[in-house]
Regions:
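Ligand-binding "clamshell"
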Residues: 97-105, 127-130, 243-254, 317-319
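A ligand-binding cleft/hinge motif common to bilobed small-molecule-binding domains
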Residues: 92-95, 226, 231-249
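Positively charged n-region of N-terminal signal peptides that target proteins for export
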Residues: 1-4
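Early extracytoplasmic/lumenal segment of secretory-pathway proteins
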Residues: 7, 19-95, 108
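Periplasmic-binding protein-like
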Residues: 199-208, 246-270
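Mature extracytoplasmic/periplasmic domains
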Residues: 269-330
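Extracytoplasmic ligand-binding site segments that recognize negatively charged/polar headgroups
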Residues: 82, 87-93, 97-212, 217-229
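Conserved C-terminal helix/tail region of periplasmic/extracytoplasmic solute-binding proteins
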Residues: 326-359
């Protein structure tokens, strides 16, 4: 057994190191201008871009992740971490504006905003992009294994999920807005419906889906689909693309009843202690080569027209992932910010469905 001999000098060095580390952490938390704290979805940026940003700017990035808009909001409201960059979804941006949690953007400091396709600017959740810059966009649809499902099932309708031939082979997203929205759209209603009768009927329809449900999960669905352990999955478009790259038998479909059209944008919360660094990051991500690299790595559609030109034509011409939004009309719906009581009603109904699914 080796003996560890520590001299007095060694102890002094260790103590000084600990003090330095503590001072560094304290300086980061107090707003050290050389640190940028980013709060983002998991696996939602190319790690090489973070390294590139650090090398170009000398700014050290502290990167934290969340798994839902609601979890992100709770952390922001707690105010314990001075986040400089956050990437929430459409309806949550509107809510955060109402709660006075976001800094109004100074567009004179933003370079490359002209690269953003006009159809992704000035959306209802943030008019004139006063508080947010487009990051990614996409749809919610159905991914299926063409070698496993019956040939007559092409999933042009949400109702195909209820086909009895899919017993124990359907994966669902663990999200109240998503799953309640699917049930609502399958009956010709809006994903933002607030009629309690319609919502109760939607939950009852979800109950009828129990025999087909293999699992209600998040990231696990990727491996289950890649390994042919499930035939069908409700997925976001970027996840579908990632799975299709690993399994050539997969097809992504957008039901004709409608889809959730979502947008994730970059915002600067009022907790930010490095606003200058935040603008540098926004400008960095707006550069076409960086936006294109990020889109290729993540798999989601970029709103950056200059970046889109740098992507393979086989990707940008694929209507599964770059659909013609005008052809959807009002059937491509963006989630609205529901009042707290109504959102809880959605959550309670979905929880009821999940509990009954375990029986």
């Amino acid at each position: 057994m080796k003996k560890l001999l520590i001299s007095a000098v060694s102890i002094l060095v260790i103590c000084l190191g600990m003090l330095y580390s503590r001072d560094f952490i304290d300086s980061s938390n107090s707003g050290d201008k050389q640190t940028l704290t980013i709060f983002n979805w998991g696996e939602y940026i190319d790690p090489d871009l973070i390294k590139k940003f650090e090398e170009e700017t000398g700014i050290s990035v502290v990167y934290e992740t969340f798994d839902s808009n609601e979890a992100m909001l709770t952390k922001i409201q707690a105010g314990s971490t001075p986040y400089d960059i956050v990437i929430p979804s459409d309806y949550m941006i509107k809510k955060m504006k109402k709660l006075n949690l976001l800094k109004k953007l100074d567009h004179s400091k933003i370079e490359g905003f002209d690269n953003i396709d006009p159809q992704f600017k000035d959306k209802s959740f943030d008019h004139n992009n006063e508080f947010s810059i487009p990051y990614f966009w996409g749809t919610l649809g159905i991914l299926y294994n063409k070698t496993k499902v019956p040939e007559d099932l092409t999933f042009e309708k949400w109702n195909n999920l209820w086909d009895t031939r899919l017993a124990n082979n359907v994966l669902l997203i663990d999200g109240a807005r998503e799953m309640m929205g699917i049930a609502l759209q399958s009956e010709g209603n809006s994903v933002n419906d607030t009629n309690e009768v319609n919502l109760n009927l939607a939950e009852r329809k979800l109950e009828l889906l129990h025999p087909n449900v293999k699992a209600i999960n998040a990231d696990e669905k990727k491996m289950l689909m890649i390994n042919n352990e499930a035939w069908v999955s409700v997925v976001f478009s970027g996840d579908a693309k990632a799975i299709m790259e690993e399994n050539e038998n997969m097809v992504y479909a957008l039901p004709k009843e409608g889809t959730n059209l979502w947008f994730d944008n970059i915002v600067i919360p009022k907790t930010s202690k490095n606003e200058e660094g935040a603008y540098k990051f926004i400008n960095f991500m707006l550069r076409p080569e960086n936006a294109a690299k990020n889109s290729e790595f993540i798999g989601y559609a970029t709103p950056n027209t200059k970046a889109k030109e740098l992507l393979p034509e086989e990707t940008t011409s694929d209507e599964q992932f770059y659909p013609d939004l005008e052809s959807f009309g009002n059937r491509a719906e963006v989630y609205e910010d529901l009042e707290k009581k109504m959102l809880q009603f959605y959550n309670d109904l979905f929880l009821k469905f999940k509990i009954n699914n375990r029986k």
